């Protein structure tokens, strides 16, 4: 089913720009416009069990994320000279292989930002040919979640929390 009025009312999402609405606000609006079955499919991504995903786009995104994690684990095990065995995922995403060495070497926060940028880019690709349908709304919700995560981040508070944690660790270490 298509939802032209609902889709047209949604603000545009751009990478790096805080969203104008939250996932919760989007879900509240979606509940009004979508059928009960489509709304259940839309929020099926919230399930921790991929078998419960009702929309194909969620399964495709999960395969993409699994591939990224597999490549990072493989590269890190090679770098650490470990003999871990990793089973490759079914799908191959060669378009991101150039970024894997950067991801494997990055600090955790930077790695997460880079992964989210790759996921956002993949969502843009998956959005092609899906305008105003349930898949487009699912992609919109995923992008909104990524952008909302970074809108809540505060570098100053994060830095202060990090420094406080380091001071506590240093104090605990000095007590030993």
PLM region descriptions:
Residues 1-176:
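Extended alpha-helical surfaces
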């Amino acid at each position: 089913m298509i939802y032209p009025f609902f889709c047209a009312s949604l603000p545009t999402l751009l990478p790096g720009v805080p969203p104008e609405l939250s996932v919760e606000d989007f879900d509240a609006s979606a509940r009004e416009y979508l059928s009960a079955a489509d709304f259940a499919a839309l929020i099926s991504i919230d399930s921790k069990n991929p078998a419960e995903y009702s929309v194909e786009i969620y399964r495709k995104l999960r395969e993409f994320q699994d591939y990224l994690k597999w490549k990072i684990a493989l590269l890190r095990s090679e770098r650490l000279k470990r003999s871990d065995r990793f089973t490759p995922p079914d799908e191959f995403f060669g378009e991101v292989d150039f970024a894997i060495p950067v991801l494997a070497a990055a600090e955790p926060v930077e790695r997460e930002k880079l992964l989210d940028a790759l996921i956002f880019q993949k969502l843009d690709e998956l959005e092609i040919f899906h305008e105003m349908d349930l898949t487009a709304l699912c992609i919109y919700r995923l992008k909104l979640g990524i952008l909302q995560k970074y809108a809540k981040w505060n570098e100053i508070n994060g830095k202060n929390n990090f420094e406080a944690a380091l001071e506590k660790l240093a104090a605990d270490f000095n007590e030993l």
